[in-house]
């Protein structure tokens, strides 16, 4: 993952509106997973790359805070008053301290764990703290993680049996194709996690 924050300038009017929304805010900053074609990139949202691609990025991490009115993504203008390292450190600390509700998945014979329906369920994959918990729950050295859409995450042991693997991939594909809940898409890939960290991704 690239730790460099990127962002394009917005119009002065847009910048002033966003800065006003977040000025003196005590709202917490969180990382948010987005696909590489996310419109926020053109609008100037700060981001770092999770999965690079030839023409930019396949998956990026945006950074934002929950204001009283809506969720506001940080832009390049925020770097005038906030340090980029401060932003990323605070975002990932807040994620680590967030209760994402990891629990066993009955539909996969309790041989999987998931976090679904919470604001930062999919972002749980970015937290070593939460991934180590998943390792322990599944008693697995290597994990396969599915985060096809926001608020959705399912995890199995990479060494699970064939039946569970097939169900897991089916569930991933079904969720990726299903837009009925309007959950924003992230990526049609599976992630391999070792020792709580992403080490590889498998495009499907």
Predicted regions and their residues:
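Residues in well-ordered beta-strands of folded domains
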Residues: 60-64, 114-116, 146, 156, ...
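Intrinsically disordered, low-complexity segments enriched in Gly and acidic/Ser/Thr residues
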Residues: 116-169
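Aromatic-residue detector
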Residues: 63-65, 123-125, 142, 179-182
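Hydrophobic, Leu/Ile/Phe/Ala-enriched alpha-helical segments that form helix-helix packing faces
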Residues: 91, 95, 99, 133-138, ...
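C-terminal structured domains
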Residues: 154-204
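Charged, alpha-helical interface segments at or near domain boundaries
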Residues: 1-120
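Flexible, glycine/charged-enriched surface loops at secondary-structure junctions
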Residues: 102-106, 144-145, 182-187
């Amino acid at each position: 993952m690239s730790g460099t924050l990127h962002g394009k300038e917005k119009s002065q009017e847009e910048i002033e509106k966003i800065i006003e929304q977040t000025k003196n805010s005590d709202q917490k900053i969180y990382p948010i997973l987005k696909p590489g074609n996310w419109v926020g990139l053109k609008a100037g949202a700060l981001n770092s790359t999770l999965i690079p691609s030839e023409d930019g990025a396949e998956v990026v991490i945006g950074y934002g805070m929950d204001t009283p009115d809506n969720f506001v993504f940080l832009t390049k203008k925020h770097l005038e008053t906030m340090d980029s390292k401060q932003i990323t450190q605070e975002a990932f600390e807040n994620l680590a301290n967030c209760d994402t509700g990891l629990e066993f998945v009955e539909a996969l014979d309790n041989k999987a764990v998931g976090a679904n329906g919470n604001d930062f369920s999919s972002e749980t994959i970015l937290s070593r703290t939460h991934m180590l918990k998943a390792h322990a729950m599944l008693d697995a050295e290597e994990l396969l993680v599915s985060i096809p859409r926001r608020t959705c995450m399912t995890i199995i042991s990479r060494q699970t049996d064939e039946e569970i693997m097939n169900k897991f991939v089916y569930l991933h594909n079904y969720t990726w194709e299903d837009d009925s809940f309007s959950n924003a898409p992230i990526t049609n890939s599976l992630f391999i996690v070792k020792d709580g960290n992403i080490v590889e991704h498998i495009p499907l």
